[in-house]
């Protein structure tokens, strides 16, 4: 990804945020794609499953790149990142037998903090918790987890709830701090205007 952002774009800040989110999304999805391809080479997954995973991982990234080439400060990139990764994460969570797959969401939860947008983060965080609860129920139903695994279940649940809760808290605080800074800048600008007139 390049960061050839024009400072004269309508929303320079969104363009910068998009660059960071895209780079993180590309990195995470690239690593997941490679990991699943290696699993296929080892004989641990079917070609169809691996191809589906790679398409779900890299498809939104391609969409982001296309949007970015047209306009760096488009809100579409933000939605490709959030919705695209949510679809991949849900697919992987519901089709795996691996106890640790839930951690795939952590890097992207960190990445979306760049937007400092509570309204954007809230449905993502709630979705992550719901997907994890459903996956835990599926693991019990399939016999992957039993009562003997309750410590692992509790760890997964509480880690996800804590990360999502903290991410939402950080989004709220960062958004308020940004609004305060903007209000202070506006007040200073108005004072300067008064002095000049």
Predicted regions, residues:
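Alpha-helical transmembrane segments of integral membrane proteins
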Residues: 18, 22-25, 50, 155-162, ...
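Alpha-helical transmembrane segments and their helix-entry boundary regions
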Residues: 74, 113, 120-125
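Short, Lys/Arg-rich, polar N-terminal cytosolic tail immediately upstream
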Residues: 1-15
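HAMP domain helices
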Residues: 149-161, 165-197
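Interfacial aromatic-anchored transmembrane helix boundaries in multi-pass membrane proteins
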Residues: 91-97, 132-157
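Hydrophobic transmembrane alpha-helices and their membrane-interface boundaries in multi-pass
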Residues: 20-97, 104-110, 128-130
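Transmembrane helix interruption/hinge and helix-loop junction motifs
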Residues: 94-99, 116-119
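Juxtamembrane non-transmembrane "cap" segments at the membrane-aqueous interface
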Residues: 123-135
């Amino acid at each position: 990804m390049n960061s050839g952002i024009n400072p004269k774009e309508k929303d320079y800040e969104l363009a910068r945020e998009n660059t960071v989110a895209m780079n993180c999304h590309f990195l995470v999805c690239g690593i997941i794609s490679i990991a699943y391809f290696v699993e296929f080479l080892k004989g641990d997954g079917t070609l169809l499953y691996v191809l589906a995973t790679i398409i779900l991982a890299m498809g939104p990234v391609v969409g982001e790149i296309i949007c970015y080439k047209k306009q760096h400060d488009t809100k579409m990139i933000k939605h490709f990142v959030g919705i695209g990764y949510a679809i991949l994460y849900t697919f992987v969570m519901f089709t795996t037998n691996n106890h640790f797959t839930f951690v795939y969401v952590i890097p992207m939860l960190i990445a979306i903090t760049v937007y400092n947008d509570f309204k954007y983060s809230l449905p993502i965080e709630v979705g992550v918790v719901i997907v994890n609860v459903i996956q835990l129920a599926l693991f019990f139903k399939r016999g992957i987890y039993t009562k003997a695994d309750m410590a692992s279940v509790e760890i997964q649940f509480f880690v996800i709830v804590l990360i999502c809760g903290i991410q939402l808290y950080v989004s709220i605080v960062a958004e308020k701090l940004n609004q305060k800074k903007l209000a202070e800048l506006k007040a200073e600008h108005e004072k300067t205007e008064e002095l000049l007139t």
